[in-house]
């Protein structure tokens, strides 16, 4: 009887562990509600973290770019474009990857700019203000700021950091006898620079950002 009782306890324990693992897997696969998850860490580079609040600009920007293409492809059902398989995976996954790569790129050059004491001039400030106006207008037209849970101040902070990053990217390129575009996030010289850094993407959080359905509603249509 004691042996049977012990076996029963072990079997129950195994079942409970399997149920917990299954529940965790389902949670990790479930899209998160972006505006409720702003403090979640999406990535880290050189001991600096990027939360979903920090990533919000990139989500809004990348979704807008892809949505314009999706509406050309199929105005009635843009989700078809977002769900399309392309080089590198499905379009929504590629968009997610691109947004993260842009954010890591800008954060790295921002860190380097701060280390070198880079300052913004009046032209930089004007360009930054124009970029903020364009982004915020596009975002609020689709009520994206509500979906992302960010304020204009949050967007301005990110765009300002991007301005510093872009300015130092130009300086860094000149120092290495390269062009500005050589250090775009897709290019080999930048990728080699990135490999020298200590960085990590928190895929448990980032993969739950449902690109195409954060600031837009591109749910699959029923037949």
Go through each PLM region and give its residues:
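Alpha-helical scaffold segments that flank or form the walls of functional sites
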Residues: 97-100
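Short, low-structural-confidence N-terminal segments
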Residues: 1-91, 191-223
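Charged, solvent-exposed helices and adjacent loops that form client-binding or oligomerization surfaces
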Residues: 65-95, 114-185
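Solvent-exposed helix-coil-helix hairpins and adjacent flexible coil/strand "hinge" segments
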Residues: 172, 181-182, 186-195, 202
């Amino acid at each position: 009887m004691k042996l049977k009782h012990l076996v029963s306890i072990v079997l129950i324990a195994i079942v409970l562990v399997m149920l917990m693992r299954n529940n965790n897997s389902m949670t990790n696969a479930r899209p998160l509600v972006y505006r409720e998850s702003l403090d979640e860490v999406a990535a880290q580079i050189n001991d600096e973290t990027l939360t979903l609040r920090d990533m919000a600009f990139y989500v809004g920007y990348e979704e807008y770019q892809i949505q314009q293409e999706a509406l050309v492809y199929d105005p009635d059902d843009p989700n078809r474009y977002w769900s399309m398989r392309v080089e590198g995976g499905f379009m929504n996954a590629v968009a997610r990857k691109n947004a993260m790569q842009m954010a890591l790129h800008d954060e790295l050059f921002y860190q380097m700019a701060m280390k070198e004491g880079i300052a913004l001039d009046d032209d930089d400030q004007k360009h930054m203000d124009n970029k903020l106006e364009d982004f915020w207008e596009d975002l609020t037209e689709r009520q994206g700021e509500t979906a992302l849970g960010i304020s204009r101040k949050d967007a301005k902070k990110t765009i300002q950091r991007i301005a510093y990053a872009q300015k130092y990217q130009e300086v860094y390129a000149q120092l290495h006898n390269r062009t500005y575009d050589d250090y775009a996030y897709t290019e080999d010289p930048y990728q080699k620079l990135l490999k020298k850094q200590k960085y990590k993407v928190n895929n448990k959080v980032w993969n739950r950002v449902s690109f195409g359905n954060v600031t837009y509603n591109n749910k699959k249509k029923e037949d």
